[in-house]
Swiss-Prot record:
Annotated PROSITE patterns: TOPO_IB_1, TOPO_IB_2
EC number: 5.6.2.1
Residues the record marks as site: Involved in religation: 167
Name this protein carries in UniProt: DNA topoisomerase 1
UniProt domain Topo IB-type catalytic: residue ranges: 73-314
This protein's UniProt keywords: DNA-binding, Isomerase, Late protein, Topoisomerase
Native organism: Rabbit fibroma virus (strain Kasza) (RFV)
GO terms for biological process, alphabetical: DNA topological change
């Protein structure tokens, strides 16, 4: 696809806006159906028909903070939403294998295996984005793989993790001495080398290879983690709140709690991570509250996974 520069409703073949795209180009049909936000700059619209745009990337632009924003067609968004159900089930089915991998590597003498064990334990604890070196260089944003020793501070009997991630969001996590992650993380920290990477023996390739053995992607763990955390918050709220607020209010509260834990906005939690089928189930089962009061969290998770699986196979 060719990329056209957009300006004031017009398309151009060059960034200097000297070569206008002919009005007969089918890309103009797309502009009749989409609204490009006025606050975006450096907007690029991709050449395609309107029908093609329904399932593809349509345009890209920079927001007021210089962050690149991507806008997709309706069918692409629908597919992405339905994929969250599949991801949740897929990760849930292998999460015990992932925990066993952590058990087998977290105290390993081999530095690479040990660091992979700590990496996976941190990921399944906090569901942090992986982070790439190119993003660190381009935007000075940090992820799990690009954490440095200076991002980890030991204070009394706890470890504080502090870094600036995607979209300049500040992340803070605490690892208490009673946490399983505490001792392995202490072993990993290089206090004399603050600017060195925490996981200096790992690379994107090594991490991807380790995760691929479970038939998932690393980003799937974050999607699973957001849903798992949301469901735990919802279950806990049902158990602890009295009187019980309306379901939609409790969903909203649980989403906000989840966003605070994971480190993004409630809107992003709901729009980009939480499986729609999960929300559907919580909203439409009139007996759910009474059911949750009498079951454990593991039993609640089984209810959710059974519902998603049955919905997918209808």
């Amino acid at each position: 696809m060719r990329a056209f520069t957009y300006k004031d409703g017009k398309l151009y073949e060059d960034k200097e806006l000297t070569i206008p795209v002919h009005c007969s180009n089918p890309t103009y049909e797309i502009l009749k159906h989409v609204k490009i936000p006025s606050h975006l700059t450096d907007v690029i619209v991709y050449e395609q028909t309107y029908e093609q745009s329904l399932s593809r990337l349509i345009f890209v632009g920079l927001d007021s903070k210089g962050r690149r924003q991507y806008f997709y067609g309706k069918m692409h968004v629908q597919r992405r939403n339905s994929a969250r159900d599949t991801i949740f089930i897929k990760v849930h089915r292998v999460i015990d294998k992932i925990h066993k991998f952590i058990d087998d590597t977290i105290e390993h003498k081999n530095d690479v295996l040990f660091q992979l064990g700590v990496f996976m334990l941190m990921e399944t604890s906090f569901f942090i984005r992986m982070g790439k070196v190119k993003y660190l260089k381009e935007n000075d944003t940090v992820g799990l793989l690009t954490l440095k020793n200076k991002n980890i501070v030991r204070e009394n009997r706890k470890i504080l993790i502090h870094f600036v991630g995607k979209d300049k969001i500040i992340h803070n996590f605490t690892v208490h001495s009673s946490n399983r992650l505490y001792k392995p993380l202490l072993r990993l920290i290089g206090r004399k080398e603050p600017d060195s990477f925490l996981f200096h023996k790992l690379s994107e390739k090594k991490v991807y290879k380790a995760v691929q053995q479970f038939g998932i992607r690393l980003k799937d763990l974050r999607t699973y983690g957001v849903n798992y955390t949301f469901l735990y918050n919802f279950w806990t709220n049902v158990k602890s709140l009295n009187p019980i607020p309306p379901i939609k209010k409790m969903i909203s509260t649980s989403i906000k709690q989840t966003a605070d834990i994971v480190g993004h906005t409630p809107s992003i939690s709901k729009r980009a991570y939480i499986a729609n089928t999960v929300l559907e189930y919580l909203t439409h089962d009139s007996e759910l509250i009474n059911t949750i009061r009498d079951i454990s969290f593991d039993e609640f998770i089984r209810l959710i996974t059974d519902y998603i699986t049955n919905t997918q196979t209808v």
